[in-house]
């Protein structure tokens, strides 16, 4: 029996989750230390597939190693199969009617509760899983697994309330016009990355919030933290079958996009994989019931440009954080550094290298370590391969350049100086703690902006450091399509939900702006309704009369 909604409810005001300091002696540090100790004492965890609310063990066992100690595993997980994907899609479609017809205030309450669970009851457990499994230090885990995840859920509810309130402004006499925002017909496939637990929650969460059903394939290197997010959503009240959790590899994705009921892809990951999936989806158009929607955030080759008028100290420190937080494994991380010669030679170079030399690299369990490991063997080999290539091309390694994979996948923060602005490390996405610097003549500022715009296929983030307003404006205009997020005198990373909607175009994705109302338009199908209160007495129009 349907439940009547007897009032128009207004959600509580939302704000960004406060981030805790984890200072020595603080209760949050003690809580996190306890969670880390407990988790390490229970390794490895077992992660099943979850289909229609039931645990499914396929006995095709894969492992999630800990990148700081790769001989040990955070969890083993049961890898899904194409047959299981078919079962999952059928189950999701069976759950669809009950979920999309659930009153909006009830769906909203579920996600508000999930936010409170993530930022409260399960805060330290989520952080511990993210630190051990994905190699984040305490602060990076805090801003991701605790704060941003909660922000995605809370602000998502606020944005959907705003979306539903968007109604036609005019009504003719005797009529009432209105718009409803239907969930998509079919299911959404969410394919989430390793580098942000919060994105793991947002990719299935955003479509589900507006009434869609979702098949979710987490990244193998983030399986355990994403499993915890799934459990939180279930505890908050997401019904069985609404989100189907299937760990595994590419075959999961391929099986899902073969279904005639596939309706949308919500993806974060590499540009090459996204392009390949787009082609595969396009080749299946004739089998789909509805044209699919493709939403993706992919790679970046992000940049800082330091104008001659820049405040040097701020530019130095922002460029340290932008490049080396989370080992450069953020889609938005600094990779290309363009510095005017007068700034480079009058303090920037010296200070930049001095600050980088202070960075401690090691396991996340040591509170002194600013950088941890890169995510795995493939990443380690790829990053060190880029460094080797840079040396072969004549690049000068100013600091770092070495790695140690004997126990964990550790790479030293690396700065390469190049005289070739289109060298390999200025063009290709490295996704690691490597910055390539190019020094330009002060008089070549506008030429350098053209280089920034034309050097890579990407268009995700960029930052401009200058005290002269005209320098900021010139760079903003000349880089109009080179970045979806631009920062003035601030590092190119760290977009906050509700403050800086995030996403880029070109080779960086569809720029649908996670963390804003924009993303939700992609997962609804609007329907206009016109109700007439006054009947016709004659079908003729006055113009027909003589």
UniProtKB/Swiss-Prot annotation:
<comment type="pathway">
    <text>Amino-acid degradation; L-proline degradation into L-glutamate; L-glutamate from L-proline: step 2/2.</text>
</comment>
<dbReference type="InterPro" id="IPR050485">
    <property type="entry name" value="Proline_metab_enzyme"/>
</dbReference>
<feature type="active site" description="Proton acceptor">
    <location>
        <position position="297"/>
    </location>
</feature>
<dbReference type="GO" id="GO:0005759">
    <property type="term" value="C:mitochondrial matrix"/>
</dbReference>
<feature type="binding site">
    <location>
        <begin position="279"/>
        <end position="284"/>
    </location>
    <ligand>
        <name>NAD(+)</name>
    </ligand>
</feature>
<protein>
    <recommendedName>
        <fullName>Delta-1-pyrroline-5-carboxylate dehydrogenase</fullName>
        <ecNumber>1.2.1.88</ecNumber>
    </recommendedName>
</protein>
<keyword id="KW-0642">Proline metabolism</keyword>
<keyword id="KW-0560">Oxidoreductase</keyword>
<dbReference type="InterPro" id="IPR016162">
    <property type="entry name" value="Ald_DH_N"/>
</dbReference>
<dbReference type="InterPro" id="IPR016161">
    <property type="entry name" value="Ald_DH/histidinol_DH"/>
</dbReference>
<comment type="similarity">
    <text>Belongs to the aldehyde dehydrogenase family.</text>
</comment>
<dbReference type="InterPro" id="IPR016163">
    <property type="entry name" value="Ald_DH_C"/>
</dbReference>
<feature type="site" description="Transition state stabilizer">
    <location>
        <position position="195"/>
    </location>
</feature>
<dbReference type="InterPro" id="IPR005931">
    <property type="entry name" value="P5CDH/ALDH4A1"/>
</dbReference>
<dbReference type="InterPro" id="IPR016160">
    <property type="entry name" value="Ald_DH_CS_CYS"/>
</dbReference>
<keyword id="KW-0520">NAD</keyword>
<dbReference type="InterPro" id="IPR015590">
    <property type="entry name" value="Aldehyde_DH_dom"/>
</dbReference>
<dbReference type="GO" id="GO:0003842">
    <property type="term" value="F:1-pyrroline-5-carboxylate dehydrogenase activity"/>
</dbReference>
<feature type="active site" description="Nucleophile">
    <location>
        <position position="331"/>
    </location>
</feature>
<dbReference type="GO" id="GO:0010133">
    <property type="term" value="P:proline catabolic process to glutamate"/>
</dbReference>
<keyword id="KW-0963">Cytoplasm</keyword>
<dbReference type="Pfam" id="PF00171">
    <property type="entry name" value="Aldedh"/>
</dbReference>
């Amino acid at each position: 029996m349907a439940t009547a909604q007897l009032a128009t409810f207004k959600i509580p005001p939302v704000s960004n989750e406060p981030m805790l300091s984890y200072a020595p002696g603080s209760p949050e540090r003690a809580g996190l230390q306890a969670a880390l100790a407990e988790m390490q004492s229970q390794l490895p965890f077992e992660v099943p597939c979850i289909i229609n609310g039931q645990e499914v063990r396929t006995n095709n066992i894969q492992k999630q190693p800990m990148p700081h100690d790769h001989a040990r595993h955070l969890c083993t997980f049961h890898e899904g199969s194409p047959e299981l994907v078919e079962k999952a899609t059928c189950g999701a479609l069976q759950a669809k009617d009950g979920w999309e017809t659930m009153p909006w205030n009830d769906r909203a309450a579920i996600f508000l509760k999930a936010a409170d669970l993530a930022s409260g009851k399960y805060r330290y457990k989520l952080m511990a899983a993210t630190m051990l499994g994905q190699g984040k230090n305490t602060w990076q885990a805090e801003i991701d697994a605790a704060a941003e995840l909660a922000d995605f859920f809370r602000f998502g509810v606020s944005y959907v309330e705003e979306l539903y309130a968007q109604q036609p402004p005019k009504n003719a006499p005797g009529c009432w016009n209105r718009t409803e925002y239907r969930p998509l017909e079919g299911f959404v496939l969410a394919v989430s990355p390793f580098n942000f637990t919060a994105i793991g929650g947002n990719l299935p969460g955003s479509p589900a919030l507006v009434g869609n059903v979702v098949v979710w394939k987490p990244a193998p290197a983030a399986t355990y933290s994403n499993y915890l997010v799934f459990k939180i959503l279930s505890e908050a009240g997401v019904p069985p079958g609404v989100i189907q959790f299937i760990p595994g590899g590419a075959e999961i994705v391929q099986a899902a996009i073969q279904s005639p009921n596939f309706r949308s892809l919500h993806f974060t990951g590499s540009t090459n994989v996204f392009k390949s999936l787009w082609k595969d989806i396009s080749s299946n158009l004739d089998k789909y019931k509805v044209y699919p929607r493709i939403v993706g955030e992919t790679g970046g080759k992000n940049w800082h440009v330091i104008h001659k008028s820049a405040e040097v100290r701020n530019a130095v420190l922002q460029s340290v954080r932008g490049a080396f937080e989370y080992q450069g494994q953020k889609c938005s991380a600094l990779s290309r550094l363009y510095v005017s010669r007068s700034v480079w030679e009058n303090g920037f170079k010296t200070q930049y290298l001095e600050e980088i030399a202070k960075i401690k690299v090691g396991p996340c369990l040591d509170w002194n370590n600013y950088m941890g490991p890169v995510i795995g063997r493939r990443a380690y080999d790829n990053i060190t391969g880029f460094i080797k290539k840079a040396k072969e091309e004549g690049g000068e390694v100013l600091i770092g350049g070495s790695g140690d994979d004997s126990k964990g996948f550790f790479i030293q923060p690396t700065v390469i100086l190049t005289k070739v602005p289109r060298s390999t490390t200025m063009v290709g996405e490295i996704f690691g703690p490597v910055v390539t610097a190019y020094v330009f003549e002060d008089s070549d500022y506008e030429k350098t902006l053209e280089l920034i715009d034309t050097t890579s296929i990407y268009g995700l983030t960029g930052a401009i450091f200058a005290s002269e307003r005209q320098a900021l404006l010139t760079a903003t205009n000349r880089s109009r399509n080179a970045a979806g997020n631009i920062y003035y005198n601030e590092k190119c990373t760290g977009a906050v939900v509700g403050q800086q909607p995030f996403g880029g175009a070109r080779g960086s994705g569809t720029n649908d702006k996670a963390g804003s109302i924009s993303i939700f338009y992609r997962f609804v199908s609007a329907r206009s309704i016109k109700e007439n209160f006054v009947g016709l007495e004659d079908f003729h129009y006055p113009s027909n009369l003589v």
